[in-house]
Amino acid sequence: KAVKYFYNLAVLPAYLRRTHAFYVGLASDMLLTKRSVTVLHDIRPLVMDTDKGFFRFKFWVHCLSTKWFAQRVFTVSDNQRHLISEKLGIPLNKIGITYNGWEHMKGVTPDESIFEKMPGVQKGEYYYALGSLAKHKNFKWIREVARRNPDKTFVVAGGKDLRAFGDDNEAKDTHNVFYPGYVSDAENAALMQHCKLFLHPAVFEGFGIPPLEALALGAPIALANATCLPELYGDTARYFDPYDYDVDLD
């Protein structure tokens, strides 16, 4: 990481001056050059207490460098556009929107061998969710809904740190919730294609790509009525209160 910072703060500005080039940063890069535009995908660390102190400080520095140096800032939803303007004091007319895409799913061939790893999961009979188990993804909602619906099956793929659910004593596999851990793009495609409903209970998102991938593969989706999700998915989705555990999934 030290090499990355040295490149961004010293090598890159010198190169841009020497070649009269213009820099487009797509990953919230720290900047010390005005010959640039950059993308802030979201500013969650500034609005949610879900990250460690040093990471939050480092992210603040990244955002301030964007505010001071970038000629223009892009983000991935109007929700984030207004949030960035509010929290960082960047004028709205300096912030553009460029949405994420789904076309990468065209090149993915579903790998149905994933079902061999979960013999208790039947095609077309499970609810599926994908993402890291970070707190803002709110996968606690799925665990609580699963407890209230013991006759339904849930699959949650992604990082497998179950402590993200809160109390370690509560973070245990249950008879109707399956955690395959990390899945490949091909395995994910198979799980999306055959799910009864794709669930996305996140309470904060800059965009939320997994529901878009699920739609691209023909899966029905149900999303939290929070953050940018209603803006982006409109009437293509069902919505639920991410703090209501008695929701009707049928």
Tell me the role of every PLM-derived stretch.
Residues 1-250:
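Carbohydrate transferase catalytic cores enriched for Leloir-type hexosyltransferases
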